[in-house]
Amino acid sequence: MKRKTKQIIITSIYLAVAIGSCYLVYKVFFGPSCHDGRQNGMEKGIDCGGSCPQQCLNGPELKNLQLGSVSVIEYKERFDVALEVTNINGQFGFGEVAYEVALYSGEEKVGRREGKIYLLPNETRYLIETGIECQAFPDKAKVYIQSGEWQEFTKEERPKLEILNKSFGYKKVAGNFFEVNLQVANRSSYDFLTVDIDAVVKDKSGKVLAVSKANLNSVKSGEVRDFRFFWPEAFEGQAQLVEIKAQSNVFDLKNLYSK
């Protein structure tokens, strides 16, 4: 074999090895992967779906939470805020959603409160914050959803919490202007460490007059528990309707256990 031909063959081999090495380095360090923070390769989302083991939970089939109109109520020289929050997704909910309630006088923020809420699939519940101090009299409030992770609902059973024997009325005695009496029945097969109860008082037009929230601890399966809401000082308007909603966070495994 001629010397020149041999040099060409050797050079070709070196080039092939170099090109192969570069391609391998690119595939390992720069090519599409399930950890590069980009939607590429066979992925259906960013580092999820398709060739990646992680499922895409934030796909287009999931809808954002729907926020209703915000009610601001002055009570005892402070301010309460209430609105309905709806999750219209059928299989996914939130074990925890962080939010901020901001109260404004004109464009100036004069009060705020941060909190957390949970929502099951296809659920509407109240978001309530009470006793917010403000630097000036607010004329509006806004609620900002800050963070939260979708969780697939895999429980066999939703909470079955029933409100029984609800009654309400004006007492107009010292320390008790208005009260609501009720019973909470746990028809679920689970015992709950905590059951959350929301109360919203409205007039005949549907305007929110007063709100409150509370919780019951250690509510056993099959148990019926008495409870009372009361407002020690007067609020404006004539109460005609009281909405009571009870719920418990089944996304939190520490909150429930079966019989």
Question: Model regions: which residues?
Answer:
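Proline/serine/threonine-rich low-complexity linkers at boundaries of modular beta-sandwich domains
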Residues: F29, Q55-K63, E152-K160
